[in-house]
Regions:
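C-terminal motif of bacterial Sec signal peptides marking the signal peptidase cleavage site
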Residues: 2-5
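Mature, Sec-exported extracytoplasmic domains of Gram-positive
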Residues: 9-201
Length: 201
């Protein structure tokens, strides 16, 4: 990834900004093979090119799609991605947060939460956060994500998953989630009982 003609901006938005390209300059950005929604890297690149969302597109030796953006195209893709993240958070069934660097997604769980409450949101946010990292100039090999599930009544971390390029499907089963949630509920009940007893005269 060549960042000649780019600069890292200090603008403070909701998420880290995309690379600032000088007018007339372009940047090549490599994308993970999982970011094409059922398309091959070649098909995804061709579609972006046909829609004039990039200057050029090709598949590199590793089989990943590389897109060449100019200043306006990069900003447009970045703005679209930020919009998609905000929409996904707004439409989520339960509270969700994405940090400024887009490398940490936090899901807040209460006693009525089911894992499927987050399933659609999760698919969207993981993909979009990786895109923001790409547009911000983070090299392909350094894009990572931490996924946290926090039990809201106590603030305890239930699960912490790490998604890297080598481990792109850090997953959690329904059974694992339900078992841990039950443990959390029992722990909370025990805590309430202890607090109640300690308040007795």
């Amino acid at each position: 990834m060549s960042l000649a003609g780019c600069s890292f901006t200090e603008e403070k938005g909701d998420y880290m900004p995309c690379l600032k390209l000088k007018r007339g300059k372009t940047v090549n950005i490599e994308f993970s093979s999982g970011s094409h929604a059922g398309q091959t890297a070649e098909e995804a690149g061709q579609m972006m090119k046909d829609q004039k969302r990039c200057v050029d597109a090709w598949v590199n030796e590793e089989g990943r799609c590389v897109l060449k953006f100019n200043q306006d195209q990069l900003k447009a893709e970045y703005d679209k991605t930020v919009g998609d993240i905000k929409t996904a958070i707004k439409q989520a069934d339960k509270p969700v947060e994405v940090n400024y660097d887009c490398n940490e997604i936090t899901y807040y769980v209460d006693n009525s939460t089911e894992l499927m409450d987050f399933s659609y949101t999760h698919v969207v946010l993981v993909g979009e956060c990786k895109l923001i990292q790409a547009y911000a100039g983070i090299p392909y090999d350094e894009r990572e994500l931490t996924i946290k599930f926090i039990y809201q009544p106590t603030g305890e971390v239930m699960f912490e998953l790490h998604i890297t390029n080598d481990n792109s499907d850090a997953s959690l089963t329904k059974e694992e989630f339900e078992k841990k949630l039950e443990e959390m509920k029992q722990g909370e009940q025990a805590g309430i009982r202890v607090r109640h007893i300690s308040r007795m005269p």
